[in-house]
Regions:
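Post-transcriptional modification and biogenesis factors for structured RNAs
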Residues: 1-267
């Protein structure tokens, strides 16, 4: 469909150049092309793929017509999710399936409004899962928030349709005046380094079950994700971890000396 009148350039404070779309394990090349076209229509230029099952260029370009072909030429392809989202300070997961382990926390429209202050100083990734099953719980654990598209009944949408809905809401929010900008948030590389450090220390002091450390770590992730952490706050938490690690090491040395002394016996 041709548009008779294009919208004027962005006048709000949501920075579209800081929005990235990440398609995780997409299966149908035509959906990749259609998603790129939807993104281009709404002013979003960053597209990444993670382990695409089929990325046959000829089929992709059938639906990525016109200028959106540039997005296909510039898109990045990754073997794992973390390298794809590592540079982003805020990550959004999308899902049609909601439940106790994946509570829907926002809608596309509310999300777009919430992103206005965040995008001033942070890059934001919006993740979409494979067509047949969506994002897994392992994918969603990297996300700051989970968004769900409300529907009247049948909740399954075509991948490109879902991308268009989110991109449209983000574009419309970019035309509205925004509030106070969020400072720079910790990116996913920094956050995952913190979580790894925290898990190692909590295992060392006996807080986590070494046979199943991820059980409590999932709860800790949820707790710490309620408010996006700034880079400075991540450094503080890692400083606490280092101090706990040092103290645990001192206790271990002290216990070792006591065992050594006890083994010597009386003179």
């Amino acid at each position: 469909m041709e548009m008779n009148e294009a919208y004027p350039a962005m006048t709000g404070t949501l920075r579209l150049e800081n929005i990235g779309i990440v398609l995780v394990e997409p299966q149908i090349p035509e959906n990749i092309g259609a998603a790129a076209r939807a993104m281009y229509n709404m002013g979003i230029r960053s597209l990444s793929l993670v382990r695409p099952k089929n990325c046959e260029l000829e089929r992709v370009l059938k639906t990525a017509t016109g200028p959106s072909m540039d997005l296909i030429e510039e898109m990045e392809v990754f073997d794992r999710l973390l390298p794809a989202i590592g540079p982003y300070g805020y990550v959004v997961g999308t899902t049609a399936r909601i439940g106790a382990l994946r509570p829907a926390q926002t809608s596309p429209r509310r999300l777009a409004r919430d992103l206005v202050p965040i995008t001033r100083h942070n890059r934001v990734a919006i993740l979409f899962g494979p067509e047949d099953r969506g994002l897994s719980n392992d994918h969603l654990r990297y996300c700051h928030t989970i968004a769900n598209i409300p529907t009247a009944g049948f909740s399954s949408l075509n991948l490109a349709q879902a991308v268009m809905l989110f991109c449209y809401e983000v574009f419309m929010a970019s035309r509205e005046p925004g509030g106070k900008a969020e400072p720079r948030l910790a990116n996913k590389f920094e956050l995952e380094g913190m979580y790894d450090h925290l898990r190692d220390v909590l295992e060392r002091i006996g807080f986590l079950d070494p046979q199943n450390p991820e059980h409590w770590m999932t709860n800790i992730r949820r707790f710490l994700s309620r408010v996006p952490l700034r880079a400075r706050e991540v450094r503080v938490i890692r400083g606490v971890c280092r101090q706990m690690d040092w103290y645990a090491g001192q206790l271990e040395k002290q216990k070792a000396r006591h065992r050594e002394d006890a083994g010597k016996g009386p003179d």
